[in-house]
């Protein structure tokens, strides 16, 4: 009986060892530890199987342990997908205060792809894979709390080139032709009529680059910024008058324009010459009528005054100045005349009377200072 028990115990001992080994192998299959490694793998088409595989990847970091679990179902068919490398920066929270980051790479799938799956009991479905950001920084790691900071791998930068020529700074001002106080300017003959504002908007910058070449050198020495004054002609719409602040600059400006004549033609300026600003000012019809009317009135007033000054003046009573009232009373200024049949004596008496009147008295000489009217004695008998 004792022999039978020993024999049975001897048979059961190997089975116990076998069961212990199987349990150890099963435990080893479930837990696999690995250090930080960099791998690049490609997922190739797999053959459907009836088992599901669980991969447990453990990264060993001093002071902390992270587990990355990836579940795969072997019954699903996945096509080949290329993978990209993603850098993980992990800073362990070791109490010693060392902040040395640990960097490792984890393969991730490329941008979003749709994978069909097949199964006996599950209908066809779609699985979406999303790629993570190119760079992930993991900081402030602790066993109980972990925070993730996501940053962009590239930063914008500015590129400047010092070899490019700097543009000439200047300005163009538009003014009315009547507001210009200078006498002369340069007429820019345009190929087609255009206002000053339109020309400034379309071709102003190019004109500054051409005409402000000399002024730019002076500006570097401390002078003011180049400024051009343009005025629209009222007589010729296709003419833009360029007015300069100093009339002595006209010859030098004309020489500069002749030097860049080909460039000016590209801007639509056919020709240019020096002209008087007053000739481009138009006068309205009302102004012309007012001037003519004023001239006619002045002529009429002048003629009337001339005739009034040459006319002989008369007294208020209507008598001529210089006539003797007594002479008018006694004879009315009429002389004595004798008829054809008058006698010589009568003519002599008339002459005596006329002589007395011409003396201014018209009276005969009186005695004792008294004047008496002369009595005429008739020669004929009554």
Curated annotation (Swiss-Prot):
Taxonomy of the source species: Eukaryota, Metazoa, Chordata, Craniata, Vertebrata
GO biological process: cell-cell adhesion; endothelial cell proliferation; extracellular exosome assembly; glomerular endothelium development; glomerular filtration; hematopoietic stem cell proliferation; leukocyte migration; mesangial cell-matrix adhesion
Main localization category: membrane
Residues on Cytoplasmic side: 309-382
Cellular location(s): Membrane
Keywords: Cell adhesion, Glycoprotein, Membrane, Phosphoprotein, Signal, Transmembrane, Transmembrane helix
Region Disordered, residue ranges: 34-60, 92-126, 318-382
Family of the protein in this entry: Belongs to the CD34 family.
Signal peptide segment: 1-34
InterPro entries: CD34 (IPR008083), CD34/Podocalyxin (IPR013836)
Location of Phosphotyrosine modifications: 326, 336
Transmembrane feature ranges: 288-308
PTM comment text: Highly glycosylated. Phosphorylated on serine residues by PKC.
Keyword Plastid: no
Topology versus the membrane: Single-pass type I membrane protein
Keyword Transmembrane helix tagged: yes
Ranges of compositional bias, category Polar residues: 344-371
Protein known as: Hematopoietic progenitor cell antigen CD34
Tissue specificity note: Expressed in the kidney where it is detected in the thin limb of Henle's loop (at protein level). Highly expressed in hematopoietic progenitor cell lines, brain and testis, and moderately in the thymus, spleen, and bone marrow, but not in adult liver.
Known function: Possible adhesion molecule with a role in early hematopoiesis by mediating the attachment of stem cells to the bone marrow extracellular matrix or directly to stromal cells. Could act as a scaffold for the attachment of lineage specific glycans, allowing stem cells to bind to lectins expressed by stromal cells or other marrow components. Presents carbohydrate ligands to selectins.
Residue positions, PTM Phosphoserine: 343
GO-annotated molecular function: carbohydrate binding; RNA polymerase II-specific DNA-binding transcription factor binding; sulfate binding
Positions glycosylated per UniProt: 50, 56, 87, 137, 144-145, 246
Membrane topology, Extracellular segments: 35-287
Entry's Gene Ontology cellular component terms: apical plasma membrane; basal plasma membrane; cell periphery; cell surface; cytoplasm; external side of plasma membrane; extracellular region; glomerular endothelium fenestra
């Amino acid at each position: 009986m004792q022999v039978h028990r020993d024999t049975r115990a001897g048979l059961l001992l190997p089975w116990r060892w076998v069961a212990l080994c199987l349990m150890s192998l099963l435990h080893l299959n479930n837990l696999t530890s690995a250090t930080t490694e960099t791998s690049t793998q490609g997922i190739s088409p797999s053959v459907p199987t009836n088992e599901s595989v669980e991969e447990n990847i453990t990264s060993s970091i001093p002071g902390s342990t992270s587990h990355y679990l990836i579940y795969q179902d072997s019954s699903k068919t996945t096509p080949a997908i290329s993978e990209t490398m993603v850098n993980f920066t992990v800073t362990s929270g070791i109490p010693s205060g060392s902040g040395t980051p640990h960097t490792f790479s984890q393969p991730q799938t490329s941008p979003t792809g749709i994978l069909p799956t097949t199964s006996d009991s599950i209908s066809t479905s779609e699985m979406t894979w999303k790629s993570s950001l190119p760079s992930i920084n993991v900081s402030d790691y602790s066993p109980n709390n972990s925070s993730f900071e996501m940053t962009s791998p590239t930063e914008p930068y500015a590129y400047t080139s010092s070899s490019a020529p700097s543009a000439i700074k200047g300005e163009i001002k538009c003014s009315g032709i009547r507001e210009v106080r200078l006498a002369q300017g340069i007429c820019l003959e345009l190929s087609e009529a255009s206002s000053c504002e339109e020309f400034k908007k379309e071709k102003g910058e190019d004109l500054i680059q051409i005409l402000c070449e000399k002024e730019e050198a002076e500006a570097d020495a401390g002078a003011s910024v180049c400024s051009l004054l343009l005025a629209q002609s009222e007589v010729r719409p296709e003419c833009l008058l360029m007015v300069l602040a100093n009339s002595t600059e006209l010859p030098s400006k004309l020489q500069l324009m002749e030097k860049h004549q080909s460039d000016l033609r590209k801007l639509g300026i056919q020709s240019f010459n020096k002209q008087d600003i007053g000739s481009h000012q138009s006068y309205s019809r009302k102004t012309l009528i007012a001037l003519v009317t004023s001239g006619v009135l002045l002529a009429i007033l002048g003629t009337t005054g001339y005739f009034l000054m040459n006319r002989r003046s008369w007294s208020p009573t209507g008598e001529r100045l210089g006539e003797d009232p007594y002479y008018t009373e006694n004879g009315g200024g009429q002389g004595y005349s004798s008829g054809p049949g008058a006698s010589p004596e009568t003519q002599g008496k008339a002459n005596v009377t006329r002589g007395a009147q011409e003396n201014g008295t018209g009276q005969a000489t009186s005695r004792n200072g008294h004047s008496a009217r002369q009595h005429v004695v008739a020669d004929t008998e009554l």
